[in-house]
C-alpha cells in the first residue's frame, strides 16, 4: 500500500468521524504508525542477533530467545495497528453502500423523487450502529493486545538479564543478555502510553455518541418547522407509485399536454 492510498483511507475515516474520532486518528497516525515505521525497525531489528547467552551449546541461544520472546514486539504492534484501524474502514464501506443505493434510487425514480438519505454520511439508523460497534471493537482490540503484551513478557519492563532454566538443550541455568534494554523499555512504554490514550479517546467518543443519540431521541417528539420525515416518506411512496403506473400505461406521464391539446386541437406542441 502506497502513501496516496493510505492518505485517501485516512481522509475518508476523518470525514465521517466525530471530534474525538479525529483526535484518535491523529494520535494513531502520528504517535503510533509513524513512530512504528521510523523507530521500530531500528530498535527491535537486532533483537535475536544480539541476544547473547553464556553458553556454547548449539541451539541454546535460539531456544532461550524463543522462550522469552514467543512473538516479536514489532510484529505484535503491527497486528494491533491493523486490527485497530480495520473497524474504521467498515464505516467507510457502509457510507459507500448508502451512496450507491441512493444513486440507484435516483436513477430508477428520477431526480424529482425524495432522497433515501438526507446525508449519506450522517450517523443515523444502521450507520450509527456500525459506528458504535466499530468503537466497541476498537476497545476490545486495544485491551486484548495490552493484556497479551503484559502477559507474554511478564509486564512492560525490559530486563537486562533473563535466565533460561530447564529448557532443552540448554544445560542447567543459562544467563542471556538483551541488546539495548533501556531503549527498548522506553519504546515499549511509549507504545503502551499511546495505546492508553487511544483507549481514553475511544471511551470518550463512545459516551459522546450514546449521549447524543439519547438527547436526539428526547427532542424527537417536539414539534419542528419545515418538512417532517413522514412527509418525505409520503413523497417517496407517491413517487414510486406514480412511476409504476407510468410504466404500466395507466397514467399519462404528461397530463398537462393532453389538456392543452383538448382545448386547442389545431395547435402543434413545441
UniProtKB/Swiss-Prot annotation:
Annotated compartments: Cell membrane; Cell junction, Gap junction
Any one GO molecular function term: gap junction channel activity
Biased composition (Polar residues): 258-270
Protein's UniProt keywords contain Cell membrane: yes
Assembly mode: A connexon is composed of a hexamer of connexins. Interacts with CNST.
Intervals, Extracellular compartment: 41-75, 150-187
Name of this chain's protein: Gap junction beta-3 protein
Noted disease: Erythrokeratodermia variabilis et progressiva 1: A form of erythrokeratodermia variabilis et progressiva, a genodermatosis characterized by the coexistence of two independent skin lesions: transient erythema and hyperkeratosis that is usually localized but occasionally occurs in its generalized form. Clinical presentation varies significantly within a family and from one family to another. Palmoplantar keratoderma is present in around 50% of cases.
Topological relation to the membrane, as annotated: Multi-pass membrane protein
Keywords recorded for this protein, A-Z: Cell junction, Cell membrane, Deafness, Disease variant, Gap junction, Membrane, Non-syndromic deafness, Palmoplantar keratoderma, Transmembrane, Transmembrane helix
Role noted for this protein: One gap junction consists of a cluster of closely packed pairs of transmembrane channels, the connexons, through which materials of low MW diffuse from one cell to a neighboring cell.
Cross-referenced Gene3D superfamilies: Gap junction channel protein cysteine-rich domain
Disordered, as annotated region: 250-270
Claim: Coiled coil is one of the keywords in the record: no
The family this protein is said to belong to: Belongs to the connexin family. Beta-type (group I) subfamily.
Impact after mutating residue 183 to K: In DFNA2B; uncertain significance
GO BP term, pick one: cell-cell signaling
Organism per entry: Homo sapiens (Human)
Amino acid at each position: 500500500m502506497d502513501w496516496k492510498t493510505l492518505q485517501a483511507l485516512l481522509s475518508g475515516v476523518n470525514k465521517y468521524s466525530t471530534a474525538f474520532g479525529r483526535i484518535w486518528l491523529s494520535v494513531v497516525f502520528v504517535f503510533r504508525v509513524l513512530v512504528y515505521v521510523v523507530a521500530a525497525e531500528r530498535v527491535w531489528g537486532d533483537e535475536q542477533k544480539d541476544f547473547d547467552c553464556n553458553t556454547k551449546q548449539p541451539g541454546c541461544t535460539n531456544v532461550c530467545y524463543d522462550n522469552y520472546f514467543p512473538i516479536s514486539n514489532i510484529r505484535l504492534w503491527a497486528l494491533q495497528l491493523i486490527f485497530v484501524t480495520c473497524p474504521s474502514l467498515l464505516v467507510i464501506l457502509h457510507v459507500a453502500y448508502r451512496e450507491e443505493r441512493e444513486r440507484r434510487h435516483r436513477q430508477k425514480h428520477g431526480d424529482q423523487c425524495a432522497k433515501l438519505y438526507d446525508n449519506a454520511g450522517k450517523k443515523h439508523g444502521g450507520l450509527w450502529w456500525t459506528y458504535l460497534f466499530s468503537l466497541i471493537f476498537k476497545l476490545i482490540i486495544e485491551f486484548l493486545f495490552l493484556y497479551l503484551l503484559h502477559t507474554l513478557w511478564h509486564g512492560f519492563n525490559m530486563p537486562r538479564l533473563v535466565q533460561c532454566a530447564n529448557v532443552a538443550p540448554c544445560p542447567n541455568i543459562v544467563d542471556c543478555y538483551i541488546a539495548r534494554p533501556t531503549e527498548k523499555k522506553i519504546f515499549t512504554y511509549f507504545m503502551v502510553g499511546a495505546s492508553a490514550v487511544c483507549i481514553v479517546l475511544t471511551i470518550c467518543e463512545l459516551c459522546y455518541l450514546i449521549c447524543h443519540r439519547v438527547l436526539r431521541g428526547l427532542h424527537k417528539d417536539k414539534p419542528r418547522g419545515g418538512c417532517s420525515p413522514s412527509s418525505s416518506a409520503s413523497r417517496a411512496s407517491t413517487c414510486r407509485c406514480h412511476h409504476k403506473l407510468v410504466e404500466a400505461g395507466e397514467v399519462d406521464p404528461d397530463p398537462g399536454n393532453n389538456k392543452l391539446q383538448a382545448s386547442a386541437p389545431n395547435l402543434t406542441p413545441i
